[in-house]
UniProtKB/Swiss-Prot annotation:
Protein encoded by which gene: argJ
Subcellular location: Cytoplasm
One GO cellular component term noted in the UniProt record for this chain: cytoplasm
Binding site for substrate: 163, 189, 200, 286, 408, 413
Active-site residues from the entry: 200 (nucleophile)
Quaternary structure, from the entry: Heterotetramer of two alpha and two beta chains.
Alphabetical GO biological process terms: L-arginine biosynthetic process; ornithine biosynthetic process
Protein's name according to its UniProt entry: Arginine biosynthesis bifunctional protein ArgJ
NCBIfam families: ArgJ, PRK05388.1
UniProt-listed Gene3D superfamilies: arginine biosynthesis bifunctional protein suprefamily, ArgJ beta chain, C-terminal domain, L-amino peptidase D-ALA esterase/amidase
Catalytic EC class: transferase
Family recorded in the similarity comment: Belongs to the ArgJ family.
Length: 413
């Protein structure tokens, strides 16, 4: 598919129409059905034609799944270098002990043999039901098709990583570094068990930029803190979530670092990709009908701004009110109050869809019909001004609908 670019005046980069994980030079991606799911794609891969500087961040859940343990160890041994990633859905390979780790390493070996690269340059990821062993005969079948061009489409990869998601999530942007075109692509999955500090969420980012692994890791950690770690669907944190980035140096320019004159341009583009994917995950929450954005400003610290934003968007009462299109701002105030952060009610100002509802801690009369009309929109915004400092943060989530219970009551069946 021919890619088209659209440039917004507020960005120093272009959003590539139909852009994807394999839009950056030197990357291919694919996916196929190997029988882990009844009739949907369930096995995917990314391959770079050259060795890529790589970095990853992982779940904070102490029951870290086998593929994450193996990938983390692999990146340490390879000193942040990868050339391929393989991922399966429908089976998390979590709580599977030493066999789970052995199976993840065997998967690495099979992929490495097919691509004729060292196994320490292969990352592995899984998502799905916890507590079941991988059916390795099916996994092997998948690895044997990695070089088959019939399955080598980014769309197939996007589908292969899904579980309860209702749609694929992907993007690519381009920018100029030293006068040369650099591209950043991304793909993600996530719908349920999404909570700050990442959960049942996988995100993969590729770029043809020239950047070293340690710089890439610092950038990824910083970006994740205010993007992927600022989303919540249901407050659960999974064993398998990971964000992984590969930069294969195929565009030859001065190595990117904080000293590069166009470093901030690259950072802005990278953060945009992460934010886009994070919001797409929040919007696709299980049973969700609305995306919720909570903008907190005037906090004494970034940590307070983030915590208050996440507390509001995690509140089941707030989420239920948004689903019911009910302007029950008392639930927002309650969440702010129990967040554990420093606040002063007399300085607190709240807007719901840009309509003031609280000023200096007091309720504000508003047009109920106008408010009701705005709450029918698919994107609901909550703005909180604390009046205590200059720190700000944004959290993303979704409403809580009847379908959330229906979906999760029958997840294994």
């Amino acid at each position: 598919m021919k890619h088209q670019e659209t440039t917004s005046q507020q960005y120093n980069f272009s959003i590539i129409k139909h852009g994807d994980i394999s839009t950056p030079q030197g990357f291919t991606a694919g996916g196929m059905h190997i029988g882990l799911r009844a009739n949907k794609k369930d096995f995917g891969w990314i391959y770079s034609s050259s060795l890529a500087s790589s970095a990853a961040v992982y779940t904070l859940n102490q029951f870290k799944a086998a593929p994450l343990i193996v990938t983390e160890d692999t990146l340490q041994k390879s000193k942040g270098k990868l050339q391929a990633l393989v991922v399966n859905s429908a089976n998390a390979n979590s709580c599977t002990g030493q066999q789970g780790i052995d199976d993840a390493r065997q998967t690495q070996t099979w992929v490495a043999q097919q691509l004729q690269i060292p196994s320490e340059h292969v990352a592995v990821a899984s998502t799905g039901v916890i507590g079941e062993y991988l059916p390795m005969d099916k996994i092997k079948t998948g690895t044997e098709h990695i070089k088959d061009t019939n399955f080598a489409t980014p769309g197939a990869f996007n589908e292969a990583i899904l579980t309860t998601d209702t749609c694929t999530k992907h993007i690519a942007v381009s920018l100029k570094i030293d006068g040369k075109t650099v591209t950043i692509g991304g793909s993600a999955k996530g719908s349920g068990m999404i909570h700050p500090n990442m959960a049942t969420m996988l995100a993969f980012i590729t770029t043809d930029a020239s950047i070293e692994s340690n710089t890439l890791h610092q950038l990824l950690k910083s970006s994740t803190d205010h993007t992927f770690n600022m989303i919540t669907v249901d407050g659960d944190t999974s064993t398998n979530d990971m964000v992984l980035v590969m930069a294969n140096h195929q565009v030859e320019h001065q190595i990117l670092s904080q000293d590069h004159p166009q470093w901030e341009t690259f950072v802005d583009a990278f953060n945009f990709v992460c934010t886009f994917l994070a919001k797409a995950i929040a919007r696709d929450g299980e049973g969700a009908t609305k995306l919720i954005s909570v903008n907190v400003s005037g906090a004494k610290s970034i940590s307070d701004a983030r915590k208050i934003g996440k507390t509001i968007v995690s509140s089941n009462l707030v989420k239920s009110a948004i689903f019911g299109e009910d302007a029950n701002f008392g639930r927002i105030i309650t969440a702010i109050g129990y967040s554990g952060c420093e606040i002063d009610p007399k300085c607190t100002y709240v807007q719901l869809n840009q309509i003031p509802v609280v000023d200096k801690g007091m309720a504000v009369l508003f047009d109920e019909q106008a408010m009701s009309n705005t709450l029918t929109h698919e994107h609901v915004t909550i703005d909180v001004q604390l009046g205590l400092g200059n720190a700000a943060a944004t959290a993303y989530g979704c409403d809580l609908s009847y379908d959330y219970v229906r979906i999760n009551a029958s997840y294994r069946t």
